[in-house]
Amino acid sequence: WGRTRIGLHSGRVIAGNVGGSGRQKYTALGDVVNTTARIESLNKQLGTRMLASAETVASAQSAQKWRSVGKFQLVGKAEGLEVFEAVGDDADPDELALFQQCLETCHSDVCVAEGMVRDYVQRYGEHKILSMHLRQAIRGEDSDVIILKKK
C-alpha cells in the first residue's frame, strides 16, 4: 500500500457538473486546483506527507503546527510559492529551530550552511529538503526559489 500525500492551497475555483447528457461528473476547475495538485505531488519529491501553500497556512485558523520548507517554482508556474510542511505536536523544537536556521543560511552563506547541515544530519539524520536547498546554494544559484522540472 502507498502512503497518502496531501496538498493544500486556497482560492476560488469553478465547481459544478461537467460533461454531456450521457456522462456528467462533478468537478472543480481552475488554477487553484492545478496548484493544489502540484503541491500534493511535491510531497513525493521532498519525502513529506502534508504540504500547504503559505496563503493557506496564513488563512487557516488551526492548532496545526507548520514549518516552512522553502519556495518552489512549481511546474507550469512563473513565480515561486512558499510551501509549509505539517509537523506533529510531538515535533522536537530543537530540530525545528535548527532546520529553519539551516534553510535560511543555505541562501545567505553557503560555507556556514554546509557545516550547519552536516550538524543537522549528525543529530537528526539526512533530510531531502535541506539537501535540495544546499545543493542549489553550492551550485551558486542566487535565487532562494527551487525550480521544479517535473510534476
What role is predicted for each listed range?
Residues W1-R3, R23, A78-G80:
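A structure-centric signal for secondary-structure junctions around beta-strands
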